[in-house]
């Protein structure tokens, strides 16, 4: 056997060219198709096998921000903080929340005291022996439409405030207090 008669196989990647396929299918000038025979045929001994190209995945390039972009990002963050678009941090605002809760509790106590005083005066006025006309006038006088907020602030508010101060006994009416003046009293109704 000579080296001319041996078949040779050439493998290439990504050969989508139509011209190469036509050359492969023609098989040479001798008119024989396929590889040459062992008995010494004069056909094209080269046969090319093509495989489809495998696309290689490109690594994502991590883009580093330029100094201008970093400063812009930082200024946007500061702007959001100024607009209070940041979620509140409970751990840092604990003292502030405690003071707000204390003020709200005092306000609720004052409101309930004022409501109970108003109901008491209204029931006392209705219980008196009156004619139907006098009762109607008394109800109109205590109706919410004729409610005088200035008179309420002058009279009812002071009485309610005294009761709250009686519970507090520290005299803390300011929001800014030091840590040594923190009131740990329980203002809930469960006592």
UniProtKB/Swiss-Prot annotation:
Residues 166-191 have a biased composition (Acidic residues). Residues 1-11, 119-153 have a biased composition (Basic and acidic residues). Residues 53-84 form a coiled coil. The keyword Cell membrane does not apply. Residues 1-52, 119-191 are annotated as: Disordered. It holds the Pfam family Rrp15p. It comes from the Eukaryota. InterPro entries: Rrp15. Keywords: Coiled coil. GO terms for cellular component: preribosome, large subunit precursor. The keyword Transcription regulation does not apply. PANTHER family: RRP15-LIKE PROTEIN. Belongs to the RRP15 family. This is RRP15-like protein. It comes from Caenorhabditis elegans.
């Amino acid at each position: 056997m000579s080296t001319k008669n041996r078949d040779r196989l050439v493998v290439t990647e990504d050969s989508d060219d139509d011209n190469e396929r036509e050359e492969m299918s023609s098989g040479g000038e001798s008119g024989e198709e396929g590889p040459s025979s062992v008995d010494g045929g004069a056909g094209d001994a080269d046969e090319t096998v093509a495989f489809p190209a495998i696309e290689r995945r490109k690594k994502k390039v991590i883009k580093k921000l330029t100094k201008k972009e970093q400063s812009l990002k930082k200024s946007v963050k500061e702007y959001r903080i100024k607009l209070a678009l940041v979620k509140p941090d409970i751990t840092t605002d604990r003292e502030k929340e405690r003071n707000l809760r204390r003020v709200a509790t005092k306000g609720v106590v004052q409101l309930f005291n004022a409501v109970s005083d108003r109901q008491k005066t209204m029931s006392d006025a209705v219980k008196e022996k009156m004619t139907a006309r006098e009762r109607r006038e008394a109800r109109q006088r205590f109706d919410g439409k004729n409610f005088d907020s200035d008179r309420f602030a002058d009279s009812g508010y002071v009485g309610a405030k005294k009761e709250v101060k009686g519970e507090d006994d520290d005299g803390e009416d300011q929001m800014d207090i030091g840590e040594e003046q923190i009131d740990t009293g329980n203002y809930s109704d469960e006592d």
